[in-house]
Curated annotation (Swiss-Prot):
The lineage of its organism: Bacteria, Bacillati, Cyanobacteriota, Cyanophyceae, Nostocales. It holds the Pfam family polyprenyl_synt. Binds 2 Mg(2+) ions per subunit. This is Dimethylallyltranstransferase. Its EC number is 2.5.1.1. Pathway: Isoprenoid biosynthesis; geranyl diphosphate biosynthesis; geranyl diphosphate from dimethylallyl diphosphate and isopentenyl diphosphate: step 1/1. Isopentenyl diphosphate binds at K96, R99, H128, R147. Mg(2+) 1 binds at D135, D141. One of its GO terms (molecular function) is metal ion binding. Prenyltransferase involved in the biosynthesis of ambiguines, a family of hapalindole-type alkaloids. Catalyzes the addition of isopentenyl diphosphate (IPP) onto dimethylallyl diphosphate (DMAPP) to form geranyl pyrophosphate (GPP). Cannot use farnesyl diphosphate (FPP) or geranylgeranyl diphosphate (GGPP). Keywords: Isoprene biosynthesis, Magnesium, Metal-binding, Transferase. The gene is ambP2. Mg(2+) 2 binds at D135, D141. Its cofactor is Mg(2+).
């Protein structure tokens, strides 16, 4: 094994085994978010013009359209028909498609093109959808609505919803392997390893268990809450960002910076989710608000208050953006997506 291979393996292991959320000293001076970032995406989405204004709504709409088209063809019909219908029902229920868009953006930042990352982007949405289907079940959050529609188990029953989620999990990995073209096998293995880690006991599943065990406890502190959400929410979001760069064969420096960016963004995302659960309407959220308070769950607003929660989210976003400084204008989409996360209303 040569020195380069050893360094790559050591770096990969360090990312997977490091403490998922690092306590960071964050400056109390919060920079004003620049609403107009200089750049524009041409039809060749790998090219940017610094003299024009980057339009995030247009960027999101274009990317979402591409992701929707890819997802539409990712799962067709089959037997048992009810299983496939259940899988498609939740996968094609809409949503922001933020996770696949983050994957595509990090791939482009690292020098890749959309086509090489689209199968992984779709797989990430499959994994996210699986987690929502299971999270909505009566045994967990017991939600009736998701993305403005009845949850899967309300339409197909709990048994089918569980099995459809189970089916989406391995299919996501199969889809990466079968559909990705022009990417070396060793890179695909690293991507699959990253995604497996993100949804397993060291990631999403572990965070979910910690969340369940913390319900109705009165002594939940901020460190515990950070642990729960850096795993339950942040692990998969980190995989979205890092996997896009892995497909291109990005070096250790790029991977580490993107990992730190994603960890900060992931926690900020959850803080804003908690805030919106308090202040947003059912129509805005597409699901029932106020569920956390009714379940007596510890949340960022319950520990910090609304204003301090927003402040902490803003600080995390500023730290995330600092990690992207060396990439200059290539990082504009990821910077803008970070700002979007704390200004969204649903």
């Amino acid at each position: 094994m040569n020195e380069s291979t050893m360094n790559t393996k050591n770096s990969e292991q360090a990312i997977l085994n490091s403490e998922y959320y690092e306590t960071q000293e964050i400056s109390h001076e919060i920079k004003t978010v620049n609403a107009s970032v200089q750049s524009s995406i041409l039809k060749d989405t790998n090219t940017y013009l610094t003299e024009a204004t980057f339009n995030l709504p247009d960027y999101l709409a274009q990317r979402r359209e591409k992701v929707e088209a890819a997802l539409e063809s990712s799962i067709t019909s089959g037997y048992p028909e009810k299983l496939y219908k259940s899988m498609r029902y939740s996968l094609m229920a809409g949503g922001k498609r933020l996770r696949p868009i983050l994957c595509l953006a990090s791939c482009e930042l690292s020098g890749g093109v959309l086509e090489m990352a689209m199968p992984t982007a779709c797989a990430l949405e499959m994994l996210h959808t699986m987690s929502l289907m299971h999270d909505d079940l009566p045994a967990l959050d017991n939600d009736d609505y998701r993305r403005g529609k009845l949850t899967n188990h309300k339409v197909y029953g709990e048994n089918i919803a569980i099995l459809a989620g189970d089916a989406l999990l391995p299919y996501a990995f199969e889809y990466i392997v079968v559909q990705t073209k022009g990417v070396p096998a060793d890179r695909l293995l690293r991507v699959i390893g990253q995604l497996s880690h993100a949804v397993g006991a060291a990631g999403l599943a572990g965070g979910q268990v910690a969340d369940l065990e913390s319900e109705k406890l009165q002594n939940i502190d901020l460190a515990t809450l950070n642990f729960i959400h850096s795993h339950k929410t942040g692990a998969l979001l980190e995989a979205c960002v890092v996997s896009g760069a892995l497909l291109v064969g990005a070096n250790d420096e790029v991977l580490w910076r993107l990992s730190r960016y994603a960890r900060n963004v992931g926690l900020a995302f959850q803080i804003i989710d908690d805030v919106l659960d308090v202040i947003a309407t059912k129509e805005q959220l597409g699901k029932t608000p106020g569920k956390d308070e009714k379940a007596q769950k510890a949340t960022y607003p319950s520990l910090l208050g609304i204003n301090e929660s927003r402040y902490q989210a803003q600080k995390l976003i500023e730290e995330a953006k600092k990690e992207l400084a060396p990439f200059e204008e290539k990082a504009i989409p990821l910077i803008s997506l970070a700002d979007y996360i704390i200004t969204r209303t649903h």
